[in-house]
């Protein structure tokens, strides 16, 4: 029950004899790829049969028969791109200089809105890392004109307007400026409703779109933000049905689809490129667009190199021979490269993908393939943290243990380059807590025990694996994290607890039916219903969705609170990992079965460049 959802516990499981003949001999999976296809499709099912074991007695196992790796290693190694040529980088550098000049050429009538629009555009296009100083200067300027009624379009504006105020509220809050949502009260009518016309002009629709986007960065107990979200959601749903298909309608649909907590920056950049000329008609948007496309494709060339490295790691580690586990390393890398597009952060992206894949492998071992005796041995081996601990492990576990051991130590080496100290003890503590939480779930299933909601939820926040996926990758970033600051990010900090809780709850709402069909009863839904006799499944889901909504607001506060002494970049990366994983659970469990949304994400953000 980790970062991904698996089948039920091993002690009641079985393995297909044709796939693995014994724990000593793993037959390699024969993988092929059709030249006209980028992925293979498969339908998961459950196989039940006996397989031979080390002992005289046969071991009964259950295997979830997950579909094979969709992204063949031969295909990955064959990828090529022309965008590594120096001429593309040289052209991008010239455009960066020209775009910096655009930040300065603004008139007094709409200079506030123009500055906000520039900041928003470079961020949504994924090129903001080149303009950190310009963004800060622009937002300092806007904030200097902010008052209790918001702002107008320009410094000479005598009245505030909703479009500029909503955009400023969201942008300033995301950058840590102390702005109050109370300004929105000034845009209500005498009946306490947000004022709007019945005509729904394009300008008004854009204002309500910015109001909707602002409402998503709400803090706890901000009633006006709740009202803004409800009102703008209803308004935009009606508007998108009436206006013709256009850049505006596409932006409404995208923002209502992904919001903020499931939005991925690189996916948004790809989407926004097609519409930003229409969004910024009063600026030289062509330069921004050309720069964004160049940067997208230059980073695409780096993605290919990193993906080849990851695919070789997956193949050389022997994971391709473990036919009972899910192979989602390409999907995990895609998520990593959708939230961090800084070329210097290769260790972060690859580390996140590797950690997530290890979590998936262990999830399939603990939830599906391993027996209780095997799981106890593996848990003890993790706590010893010594290659000699593999002596008593079954053959298939020996290889997995060594990959975990070597990868975690390798990541600690990368972290030492950034942190200037050995951080392996943090990683070991995280892995021990993670494995212990797995064993607790294994014992619940083995004994037929259904824990209380609170007990399941607290354990599930650890077993989800968020701590493992975050800890070592953020330590590789070029931001020193001394012990007292790191404690505010890692478990059991408030920040980490909120992130883990959100993902555990969201994951369970997407996985519980499939898990229950495979015999695994414990979930937030079943535990809530057991604690509250008479509660229906719908009652449980409503309760959990309400919990998630409140936790999201608290999470916003932990990330954005103005007195935050933790480096923003570190918390932002941890927050973005939450967004990435949450994205996979938007409609269903996108990790057990790689659905079309996940496949398309890989293609549009990693495999395909944009036309220049």
Curated annotation (Swiss-Prot):
It catalyses: (2E)-geranyl diphosphate + H2O = 1,8-cineole + diphosphate. Keywords: Chloroplast, Lyase, Magnesium, Metal-binding, Plastid, Transit peptide. Its cofactor is Mg(2+); Mn(2+). Mg(2+) 2 binds at residues 363, 367. A motif (DDXXD motif) lies at residues 363-367. It comes from the Eukaryota. One of its GO terms (molecular function) is 1,8-cineole synthase activity. It is an enzyme of class 4 (lyase). InterPro entries: Isoprenoid_synthase_dom_sf, Terpene_cyclase-like_1_C, Terpene_cyclase_plant_C1, Terpene_synth_N, Terpene_synth_N_sf, Terpene_synthase-like, Terpene_synthase_metal-bd, Terpenoid_cyclase/PrenylTrfase. PANTHER family: OS04G0344100 PROTEIN-RELATED. CDD domains: Terpene_cyclase_plant_C1 (cd00684). One of its GO terms (biological process) is monoterpenoid biosynthetic process. GO terms for cellular component: chloroplast. Residues 1-52 form a transit peptide. The Asp-Asp-Xaa-Xaa-Asp/Glu (DDXXD/E) motif is important for the catalytic activity, presumably through binding to Mg(2+). Binds 3 Mg(2+) or Mn(2+) ions per subunit. This is 1,8-cineole synthase, chloroplastic. Its EC number is 4.2.3.108. Belongs to the terpene synthase family. Tpsd subfamily. Pathway: Terpene metabolism; oleoresin biosynthesis. It is found in: Plastid, Chloroplast. Terpene synthase (TPS) involved in the biosynthesis of monoterpene natural products included in conifer oleoresin secretions and volatile emissions; these compounds contribute to biotic and abiotic stress defense against herbivores and pathogens. Catalyzes the conversion of (2E)-geranyl diphosphate (GPP) to 1,8-cineole.
